[in-house]
Design a protein with these regions (language model features):
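Beta-strand acidic-aromatic groove motif in beta-rich domains, primarily in extracellular
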Residues: 91-104, 143-144
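Surface-exposed coil/turn segments at beta-strand junctions on protein surfaces, enriched
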Residues: 61, 75-77, 123-125, 135-139, ...
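Secreted extracellular polysaccharide-interacting domains
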Residues: 56-75, 107-116, 145-147
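Extracellular polysaccharide-targeting segments
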Residues: 1-38, 147-201
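Extra-cytoplasmic beta-strand recognition segments
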Residues: 33, 59, 64-97, 130-134, ...
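Extracellular beta-strand ligand-recognition surfaces/modules
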Residues: 98, 129-160
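Extracellular carbohydrate recognition and processing domains
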Residues: 107-140
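Short carbohydrate-recognition loop motifs
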Residues: 41-65
Length: 201
């Protein structure tokens, strides 16, 4: 098993081959514009005019729970990281927060399920990236999502990213997104995309 040792003045962390990102591509599809039919609860969100830090479309919603997600087959022994850009409108929320949730149809949940990631009262003015690294207890189809437990605060969501490994990668397209765009890519770029897809497929 491959291991990388990160030296730090305070601690030493060993990264195994399951925690090192092996692909820069998103496991979620259609995240630049919320396209496709894989999204859950997308009908509860409205399109807004904000542009994300990566130049993508965003969606907004005032309401608790019902986080944006897609059903994904995840495996035991693999480490995953989910991240997103969020913009929290001005609020006076006290103890409410954005957390991460993940479960399958049989009630199995991800590690650190329901973990608070950002208390709304502490949210800065502008976009901020939230992220969470997790594992799953069983090989199954999971719905991983960020959610707020406050039904009175409007939140904008964008740049959803799910990648393998313990490091939150910058937002990127999925392989399915790139494959769907190959027909519209200029000839001079097709070889680059084709080689890239072959290397990581």
């Amino acid at each position: 098993m491959m291991q990388l040792i990160l030296n730090d003045a305070k601690k030493q962390k060993v990264l195994t081959d399951s925690s090192v990102p092996i692909s820069p591509y998103n496991l979620f599809d259609g995240t630049s514009d919320f396209s496709g039919t894989s999204w859950t609860t997308l009908d509860l969100y409205t399109n807004d005019k904000l542009v994300s830090p990566f130049g993508n479309q965003s969606r907004q919603r005032k309401g608790a729970w019902m986080g944006l997600s897609q059903l994904k087959d995840l495996k035991v022994g693999q480490i995953y990281t989910i991240s997103a850009s969020v913009f929290v409108d001005t609020n006076d929320s006290s103890d409410k927060f954005i957390g991460v949730y993940g479960d399958d149809s049989k009630g199995n949940v991800i590690s650190s399920n329901n973990k608070p990631l950002l208390y709304l009262k502490n949210a800065p003015v502008g976009w901020i990236t939230i992220k969470h690294t997790f594992t799953v207890p069983k090989n199954a189809t999971y719905k991983i999502r960020f959610e707020s437990n406050d039904d009175q605060v409007n939140i904008h969501w964008a740049d959803l990213m799910l990648n393998k490994g313990a490091v939150a990668l910058d937002w990127n397209y999925s392989l399915n997104d790139l494959r769907s765009r190959l027909g519209g890519v200029k000839p001079s770029y097709r070889l680059y995309y084709a080689i890239s897809l072959k290397e990581v497929a």
